[in-house]
Amino acid sequence: MKIKRICIDLDGVISQLKKENETYADVEPIAGAVEKLTSLKTSGHYIIILTARHMKTCNGNIGLVHRRIANITMDWLKKYKIPYDEIHFGKPWADIYIDDNAYRFVEWEKIDGNGDNLPQSHESQVRGG
């Protein structure tokens, strides 16, 4: 098994999408998320969480995003014992994302606990440049 760096969107993949009458502190994890992420982390994978929370309402101002939502998000991850190595705020808000290394998330049951059925990156990274 090759250890992978796995970058995972927060809302709609790890946490339920926030409803109009909720705050981000109120949302629940998606079924299977905690268990599967724990299994992936235990298998040695490097987990990166990426979120676009407040990017639209803050007009892309990442400093303002941090002030408004970072502590709430970090507390939520701790509350639900979500394992991760990095978290990145500032995913640009968009209607659709096109990426050559994307995996279309449907449900956590479709992902092996050790990550073996996740696609392998076909990009080769060159240092420098």
Map each language-model feature to its residues.
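Catalytic phosphate/metal-binding cores of nucleic-acid and nucleotide-processing enzymes, i.e., regions
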Residues: 1-129
